[in-house]
From Swiss-Prot:
This is Large ribosomal subunit protein uL16. It comes from the Bacteria. The keyword Ribonucleoprotein applies. The keyword Disulfide bond does not apply. It comes from Alteromonas mediterranea (strain DSM 17117 / CIP 110805 / LMG 28347 / Deep ecotype). InterPro entries: Ribosomal_uL16, Ribosomal_uL16_bact-type, Ribosomal_uL16_CS, Ribosomal_uL16_dom, Ribosomal_uL16_sf. The gene is rplP.
Amino acid sequence: MLQPKRMKFRKMHKGRNRGFAAGSTVAFGTYGLKAVGRGRMTARQIEAARRAMTRHVKRQGKIWIRVFPDKPITEKPLEVRQGKGKGNVEYWVCQIQPGRVLYEMEGVPENLAREAFELAAAKLPFKTTFVTRTVM
């Protein structure tokens, strides 16, 4: 699963997930999966969606993951009283704003890419849409 190799600080404040996304255009592949809603995507969700896409296209073409989970989420153990410091890092997330391209794909027909992205979207906690690369 994805997580940073090293960080300056182990734990982070919760923060807010406002604004609009950087990385809102298809940059590498021909087709993309773009977030319509906002939320946070765990490293497990990123991997589950990637596996679903890879299996559906039978390892043809190329897939790019455009997001990286760089925010640690801490949790205190069950039945532990409040206080005594912040909990341990349990998992990593990536904060997603509307317009962010999550995955890209090339080297497969459009209908196959659409189906693969639908399978991936079912694994994610927010709404997504299929986009194609625009040539300028």
